[in-house]
Amino acid sequence: MASLLKSLSLFKKTREQPPLASGSGGAIRGIKHVIIVLIPGDSSIVTRSRLLDRLVRMVGDPEVSGPKLTGVLISILSLFVESPGQLIQRIIDDPDISIKLVEVIPSINSTCGLTFASRGASLDAEADEFFGTMDEGSKDHNQMGWLENKDIIDIEVNDAEQFNILLASILAQIWILLAKAVTAPDTAADSEMRRWIKYTQQRRVIGEFRMNKIWLDIVRNRIAEDLSLRRFMVALILDIKRSPGNKPRIAEMICDIDNYIVEAGLASFILTIKFGIETMYPALGLHEFSGELTTIESLMVLYQQMGETAPYMVILENSVQNKFSAGSYPLLWSYAMGVGVELENSMGGLNFGRSYFDPAYFRLGQEMVRRSAGKVSSTFAAEFGITKEEAQLVSEIVSRTTEDRTTRATGPKQSQITFLHSERNEAPNQRLPPITMKSEFQGGDKYSNQLIDDRLSGYTSDVQSSEWDESRQITQLTQEGDHDNDQQSMDGLAKMRQLTKILNQSDTNGEVSPAHNDRDLLS
């Protein structure tokens, strides 16, 4: 039996492993298309600032083709380094595109103010055509409209510090778009705005350089549809992380934004580990979880073997990403979501509407948290040297805080409805005889003798109306502050007792009792 379990574990691990790369054949290359990437031909801030201005306007041009837009965005993303050309050549390894670097320098003869660097030949006309600037009269039209602040005509500056903060403001907006451009582009606007406000408050960006919605939508859509652009952005992030020593301020900002980008699309896998396994509740010992726990274990090993690109597998469209979806471990995922909802308020907005969601195991996770509140793990207690008295003290404190949190979350509990009872020294023969009541409404409820007898047990039929009114007043004083439902129940009980008294008197006198309508009595 032990060998069977060992073979099963090895089988599942082998099943989850991707095919290993072999040296028998060469790498498969696709049909490449050429991407033109513009880089500054000198170290002048004027050249970079003017190039940035022209590139930003090109992004918002609807006539720019997809490959050209990709090259423009790569140019903007690499402008913050000292040698953009060397950076691009070092990190680009894409089987779908071929990068062609073109240097630009200032020009007084071209309309756009830039030209392509060449040996003797004048390429001013080609530069104007590439940038889409045909004449000086279209300058205002081309330069305005892509910033929310309409008063800004252009973004050309001469100072290096001003250029860095301006470039950081534009780069921050592009990198923020990568976080949800693939996983949730339709609902990304709110989170993107929150992160923009964060960097504005930290003085990393300038709020006046916020791009308008049209410009941001164009960039987001291009990031979502172009895998080569995403490969470049991920490669740039990894290159920044690997670089030693102090990093430029823009590079540090990119690493900070990466905290929102990393593990995008892997929320189910990460949250299952966090709430399902790391909490170490005894429910993990269920037989139903044994197979899925082995699956999670093999996926964690696979995640480690993928290396530094593992957190970006969804952004990079790696085919192995499907193995990490919650459909591979539905019961454990449902249980983990129940645990997470009880432990963290932020989990309440998570979307659970999936076909493999199991409500039973979701409730299991919730109940596991509720019933384990205040309990101290014996393993952790022994590791941290916690005594039995200290563990008991912790349990008491946690129980009280949990009750306070539940009260604040659910609101005050409604008081129970209290009914009047007769004095205990009353004779037992004064109980009401069984009475049958039938509603005259079609399809109305029919109350049996036993039901009426149970609800009116202990009440006498000769209670005077004045005594009943006095009892009602006392009850109202004791129940002051309760909800209106309590008062309605008391009124209904009073009218039911009046009906009982009338029926009892009719039976005693031997007269035919008149027909009473329930609607009149209970109105």
From Swiss-Prot:
Subcellular location(s) of the protein: Virion; Host cytoplasm
Functional summary from the UniProt entry: Forms the helical nucleocapsid (NC) in a ratio of 1 N per 6 ribonucleotides, protecting the genome from nucleases. The nucleocapsid (NC) has a helical structure with either 12.35 or 11.64 N per turn, approximately 20 nm in diameter, with a hollow central cavity approximately 5 nm in diameter. The encapsidated genomic RNA serves as template for transcription and replication; encapsidation by N is coupled to RNA synthesis. Forms the encapsidation complex with the phosphoprotein protein P. Before encapsidation, the newly synthesized free N protein, so-called N0, is chaperoned by P.
Protein name per UniProt: Nucleoprotein
Organism (species): Phocine distemper virus (PDV)
InterPro entries per UniProt: Paramyx_ncap
Region (Ncore), start-end ranges: 1-403
Stretches the record annotates as RNA packaging and organization of the helical nucleocapsid: 1-375
Cellular component, GO, one term: helical viral capsid
Family: Belongs to the paramyxoviruses nucleocapsid family.
